[in-house]
């Protein structure tokens, strides 16, 4: 038996534009995805040769709400990967959840990305096949396989990795406790005008802050209509000393604030935690 202990970092959408909608119902997006030190931890065990693959299991620990052990992103990734395994085997995965679920931080997508990355390397599966598997599991999973800053297009399959990350890496994440949002439900309410596609270039990387201030999260107002408290979270982050950019991540409900220094980020997290005990607050660093 082989055993691996891996991290699945939280995903943050620094911006998210909805640019079109396919006949299949999928929305086409553009966004800048980054990943944080805040992580779930996965213990992946691969059984001996000729183990029964249908005995593969997933167990979740420390999740703030119950996750179906049979129908989830990790099990879906495992089942798809097993089709390309060089030997008949089984996989067991134990996931320690530190990233809130259904909160716009890619908790499930990052778990699946870590599984695709780990088993893909172990079984030497071609990267093209891995990308197809990742997209089959979920739109955010392809970006989560490498967990590096990336500009994303399409439904999540077009990736342009950031060569130079010109932003401070000090981040505070905030989420109202016991509030969750369904990504499909939030997207289904997007009925407004689509955003114009962005012409991404190396120039945008030179001053990411300037670039980001000209962007937004097209799902933010929709999410606020479901959870009005999101508006308070964003304004609270903006009001903290050293805050340079604050908005909602993904389809919500979590929000992020980027700060000019580690000291100001730590102070903001402490301050918000004291004033808003009903909010989950996390001071972390971006992975660049």
UniProtKB/Swiss-Prot annotation:
Keywords: ATP-binding, Isoprene biosynthesis, Kinase, Nucleotide-binding, Transferase. This is 4-diphosphocytidyl-2-C-methyl-D-erythritol kinase. It catalyses: 4-CDP-2-C-methyl-D-erythritol + ATP = 4-CDP-2-C-methyl-D-erythritol 2-phosphate + ADP + H(+). Belongs to the GHMP kinase family. IspE subfamily. The keyword Transferase applies. GO terms for molecular function: 4-(cytidine 5'-diphospho)-2-C-methyl-D-erythritol kinase activity; ATP binding. Gene3D superfamilies: 3.30.230.10, GHMP kinase, C-terminal domain (3.30.70.890). InterPro entries: GHMP_kinase_C_dom, GHMP_kinase_C_sf, GHMP_kinase_N_dom, IspE, Ribosomal_Su5_D2-typ_SF, Ribsml_uS5_D2-typ_fold_subgr. Pfam families: GHMP_kinases_C (PF08544), GHMP_kinases_N (PF00288). Pathway: Isoprenoid biosynthesis; isopentenyl diphosphate biosynthesis via DXP pathway; isopentenyl diphosphate from 1-deoxy-D-xylulose 5-phosphate: step 3/6. It is an enzyme of class 2 (transferase). GO terms for biological process: isopentenyl diphosphate biosynthetic process, methylerythritol 4-phosphate pathway; terpenoid biosynthetic process. Transmembrane segments: none annotated. ATP binds at residues 100-110. The active site is at 11, 140. Catalyzes the phosphorylation of the position 2 hydroxy group of 4-diphosphocytidyl-2C-methyl-D-erythritol. Its EC number is 2.7.1.148.
């Amino acid at each position: 038996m082989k055993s691996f202990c891996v991290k699945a970092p939280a995903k943050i959408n620094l911006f998210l534009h909805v640019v079109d909608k396919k006949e299949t119902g999928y929305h086409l997006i553009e966004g800048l995805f980054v990943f944080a030190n805040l992580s779930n931890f996965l213990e992946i065990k691969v059984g001996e040769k000729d183990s029964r693959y249908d005995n593969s299991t997933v167990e979740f620990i420390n999740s703030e709400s119950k996750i179906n052990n049979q129908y989830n992103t990790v099990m879906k990734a495992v089942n798809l990967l097993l089709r390309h395994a060089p030997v008949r085997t089984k996989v067991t995965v134990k996931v320690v959840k530190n990233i809130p679920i259904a909160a716009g931080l890619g908790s499930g997508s990052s778990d699946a990305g870590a599984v695709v990355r780990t088993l893909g390397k172990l079984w030497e599966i071609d990267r093209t096949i891995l990308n197809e598997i990742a997209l089959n599991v979920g739109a955010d999973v392809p970006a989560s396989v490498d967990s590096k800053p990336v500009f994303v297009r399409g439904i999540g399959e077009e990736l342009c990795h950031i060569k130079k990350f010109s932003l401070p890496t000090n981040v505070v994440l905030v989420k109202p406790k016991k509030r969750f949002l369904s990504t499909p439900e939030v997207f289904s309410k997007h009925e407004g005008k689509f955003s114009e596609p962005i012409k991404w270039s190396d120039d945008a990387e030179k001053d990411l802050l300037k670039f980001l201030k000209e962007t937004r999260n097209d799902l933010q107002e929709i999410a606020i209509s479901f959870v009005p408290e999101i508006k308070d979270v964003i304004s609270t982050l903006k009001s903290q000393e050293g805050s340079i950019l604050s908005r909602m991540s993904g389809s919500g409900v979590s929000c992020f604030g980027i700060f000019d220094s580690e000291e100001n980020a730590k102070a903001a997290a402490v301050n918000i935690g004291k004033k808003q005990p009903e909010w989950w607050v996390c001071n972390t660093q971006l992975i660049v």
